[in-house]
């Protein structure tokens, strides 16, 4: 566990930062997804999510993060997958599906850092995310294709006779 000025970072036994995120959909059809502006690069879009707090369950962390970053409440659905990122940072992110039931007019990150949110068709969101956050595009590709992620490593169990 490491402390940042405004949060505590938690790590799993393998040294991965524990994160949670949600693909927030306008309806159960899952054809329009909500993205938020990056705090670091306000002209770029990302999937809302962030670090898990000590003793916090992944689903609870995902709901808290989308409330803080996107100003939405909703019905938490299935766990889409657990994605690892090893390139620039060691992250392990639990990604859930959430159907939005309420959009707040003002929310924590809109007031404090001017964060924006916008609905995208899934295909458009994938294109937007591939430039800046390819691992986030991967979440939607897995959802759309029902397959395994390609850039990060999915933590789906593999059979003993598969190639490493």
UniProtKB/Swiss-Prot annotation:
Binds 3 Mg(2+) or Mn(2+) ions per subunit. Mn(2+) may be the true cofactor in vivo. Mg(2+) 3 binds at residue 65. Optimum pH is 8.5. A motif (Nudix box) lies at residues 50-71. Residues 17-144 form the Nudix hydrolase domain. Keywords: Cytoplasm, Hydrolase, Magnesium, Manganese, Metal-binding. It catalyses: diphospho-myo-inositol polyphosphate + H2O = myo-inositol polyphosphate + phosphate; P(1),P(6)-bis(5'-adenosyl) hexaphosphate + H2O = adenosine 5'-pentaphosphate + AMP + 2 H(+); P(1),P(5)-bis(5'-adenosyl) pentaphosphate + H2O = adenosine 5'-tetraphosphate + AMP + 2 H(+). The active site is at residue 68. CDD domains: NUDIX_DIPP2_like_Nudt4. One of its GO terms (molecular function) is bis(5'-adenosyl)-pentaphosphatase activity. It is an enzyme of class 3 (hydrolase). InterPro entries: DDP-like_NUDIX, NUDIX_hydrolase-like_dom_sf, NUDIX_hydrolase_CS, NUDIX_hydrolase_dom. It is found in: Cytoplasm. Residues 144-164 are annotated as: Disordered. Its EC number is 3.6.1.52, 3.6.1.60. Mg(2+) 2 binds at residue 65. One of its GO terms (biological process) is diphosphoinositol polyphosphate metabolic process. The keyword Nucleotide-binding does not apply. Belongs to the Nudix hydrolase family. DIPP subfamily. Cleaves a beta-phosphate from the diphosphate groups in PP-InsP5 (diphosphoinositol pentakisphosphate), suggesting that it may play a role in signal transduction. Also able to catalyze the hydrolysis of dinucleoside oligophosphates, with Ap6A and Ap5A being the preferred substrates. The major reaction products are ADP and p4a from Ap6A and ADP and ATP from Ap5A. Also able to hydrolyze 5-phosphoribose 1-diphosphate. PANTHER family: DIPHOSPHOINOSITOL POLYPHOSPHATE PHOSPHOHYDROLASE, DIPHOSPHOINOSITOL POLYPHOSPHATE PHOSPHOHYDROLASE 3-BETA. This is Diphosphoinositol polyphosphate phosphohydrolase 3-beta. The lineage of its organism: Eukaryota, Metazoa, Chordata, Craniata, Vertebrata.
């Amino acid at each position: 566990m490491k402390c940042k000025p405004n949060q505590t970072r938690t790590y799993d036994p393998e040294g991965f930062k524990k994160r949670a995120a949600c693909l927030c959909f306008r309806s159960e059809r899952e054809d329009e997804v909500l993205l938020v502006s990056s705090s670091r690069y306000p002209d770029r879009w990302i999937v809302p999510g962030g670090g898990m707090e000590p003793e916090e369950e992944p689903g609870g962390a995902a709901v808290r993060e989308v409330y803080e970053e996107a100003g939405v409440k909703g019905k938490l659905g299935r766990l889409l997958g657990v994605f690892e990122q090893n390139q620039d940072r060691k992250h392990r992110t639990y990604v859930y599906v959430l159907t939005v039931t309420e959009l707040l007019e003002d929310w924590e990150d809109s007031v404090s850092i001017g964060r924006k949110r916008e609905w995208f068709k899934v295909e458009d969101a994938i294109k937007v995310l591939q430039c800046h956050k390819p691992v986030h595009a991967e979440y939607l590709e897995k959802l759309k294709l029902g397959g395994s992620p390609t850039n990060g490593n999915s933590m789906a169990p593999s059979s003993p006779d598969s190639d490493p």
